Regions:
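Extracytoplasmic
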Residues: 37-39, 62-66, 77, 90-92, ...
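N-terminal secretory signal peptides
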Residues: 24-68
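Short, exposed beta-strand-loop hairpins at the edges of beta-sheets
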Residues: 104-114, 118-121
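Bacterial N-terminal signal peptides that target proteins for export
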Residues: 1-8
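Short Fe-S-cluster ligation motifs
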Residues: 82-105
């Protein structure tokens, strides 16, 4: 058994710790609720699109969620559209719609009050 690749990988681990990373900050909210996400205060206003693939289906495309949000930063207020897993550049970083619950189902429509959104902000490096 050749241990050399394993030893090299273990020796490289401390070097990975030296990489500069900025931790992401997240918040989970409903429509109309405001979350502090990094330097932003974000309020989801309206689901513009929810084309996610239903749990019971096999889809070629996973689909997406488009969400209208109000963002307050440094006293300024603006309305933006965020799209699932597509970062939006704001306030020296990126705002991302990182998760949406509940999963879609072909058997029932999701009521607006049932949506939960996970928003994440990552500072630019």
């Amino acid at each position: 058994m050749n241990l050399r690749p394993t030893l090299i990988a273990l020796a490289a681990l401390p070097l990975l710790g030296a990489c500069a990373t900025v931790p992401a900050e997240a918040g989970s909210v409903r429509l109309g609720q405001t979350a502090s996400v990094g330097p932003l205060r974000v309020t989801p206003l309206r689901v513009l699109e929810d084309s996610r693939c239903p749990m019971e289906a096999r889809c070629v495309w996973a689909g997406q969620v488009r969400l209208q949000v109000r963002v307050v930063h440094a006293g300024h207020r603006a309305v933006h559209e965020v799209v699932s897993n597509k970062p939006l550049a704001l306030a020296g970083g990126n705002l991302e719609l990182a998760g949406v619950m509940p999963p879609t189902s072909a058997l029932r429509k999701i009521a607006p009050r049932d949506y939960r959104f996970t928003l994440r902000f990552e500072r630019a490096q």
